[in-house]
Amino acid sequence: MKRPGLFITLEGIDGTGKSTQYRRLLSYLKQLGYSVCATREPGGTRVGEQIRRILLDSSSKTMTALAELVLMYAARAQHLEEVVRPALDRGQVVMSDRFNDASMAYQGYGRKLGTKIVRALDRIVCGMTQPDLTLVLDLAPKVALKRAQGRELRRSSRRGRFEAESLKFHEHVRRGYLAIARQEPKRVKVVKADRPVDEVQSEIRKMVEEFLARHRR
């Protein structure tokens, strides 16, 4: 059954500026008067944030690809039950910094688990609750990783498990995101992130405005 709210997700490999664009879009939608539920993955709930710490901790080096995928979907199950579905039922616009496409890109392609196992888990956990619009921030992995490393230096923070992965890993993840976009062109829009922040945000706003206009008629 289709819920009354709308579900927008932002995706992309680390270093694309995704979180910056997410915050700007969130502020813009609120200015327009939309009731927005802002959330993220992994996380979004108390249980989900605990799982997030395990997943991103650089000391979790021995975690297997399958364990990583199952933990992602455990956090997602809690997130859907506590946050996403209730907000959609209230008629809100749900905006999530990553959702299930990240599992397909990172675990399906990056970890090479394949698409079948990710889809099987997704059917069980997400079912019919899928994003209505997904914006993928796209950038060459070599450039994105340099950006991410610069951010870590500015914040004096440790590299997380995913940011510490090889260039080849991030190339596979990017390939995954672009494959999803080719398979679902109506839902998934690719936004080139190799431009000034304001220019990227302008394109994102245009895409979202067109989407909202279609769905609010």
Where are these regions (language model features)?
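NTP-dependent small-molecule kinase module
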Residues: 26, 142-217
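Hydrophobic positions on the alpha1 helix immediately C-terminal to the Walker A/P-loop
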Residues: 21
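A glycine- and Lys/Arg-enriched "phosphate-lid" helix/loop adjacent to the NTP-binding pocket
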Residues: 103-175
